[in-house]
Amino acid sequence: MLLSWIEDPNADDLVAFLNDELRQPGRWLQVAGEMEVEYPGRAANMESAGDYLLILKPDASLQIHAARGIKPLNWQPQVENAPVMQDGGRAVLHAERRSPAEWARGAFL
């Protein structure tokens, strides 16, 4: 069930919306749009700007999918922290986990 959505937001509105959604227990967070993806961990990658789907599930797992293919570009089994902040005029989700220590970042363009 779709509980809330935002269309074509500016960076400030997207940051506020996503952080509000992340505070709601048991919510699925799905963001589709143009973004850059960075992950310096086990399978390091830096994806150029493109259309991606970012999913943060109620079990705190994170997946980032490209427009093609069935496997995610990045998958984190459980993130402890996933704040959304503004950086350089863009909304950025920075998901972190402690064990192993790694992070994934999605910058929404």
What are the functions of these language-model segments?
Residues 93-109:
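Surface-exposed beta-loop interaction hotspot
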Residues 35-37, 66-68, 95-100:
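Short acidic, glycine-rich loop/turn motifs
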Residues 42-92:
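Acidic, aromatic-enriched beta-alpha/helix-loop junctions
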Residues 1-61:
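Short Lys/Arg-enriched alpha/beta "domain-start" segment
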